[in-house]
Amino acid sequence: MPELPEVQAVVNHYKPVFLKQKIERISNPNSYSKVFATHTLPKLNKNVGGQLIKDVFRRGKYIVLQTEKGYLCIHLRMTGQLQESLDSFVADKHCSFAIHLNKGKTIYFKDYRKFGRLYYYSTLDTLNACLLYTSDAADEF
């Protein structure tokens, strides 16, 4: 699992790529549906399609894309990576989702072990509660 500085490096790299772009849609090249933790792909596209990305930041080990109506949260887990291009083998087999932006730009989520997840929340309250719960539980040990 990436450490916080590695997740922050991903945020720093992709913030200029995502910022002020509109999400056209999200696709699922390898048909692995468990990557979508909170919503099905059609419902996710209904929530984020056409939304402008207003900010990109890190919350814990989550990469958060703030849209006009909610938050798209990416957790890399063990082997997840965001990439701007993929060869066809990886796209077919290891690309769990792709975020299609306006102007023809696509960001791919490559995950060999399929542990990474994509979440959508209308507010950050649920994500914040999860992060507080896990850090509180860790303090007990």
Identify the role of each PLM range.
Residues 1-68, 89-91, 100-105:
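Extended, highly charged segments
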Residues 68, 72-135:
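Phosphate/anion-contacting hairpin/loop surfaces
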Residues 136-141:
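A short, hydrophobic C-terminal helix/tail in secreted or cell-surface proteins
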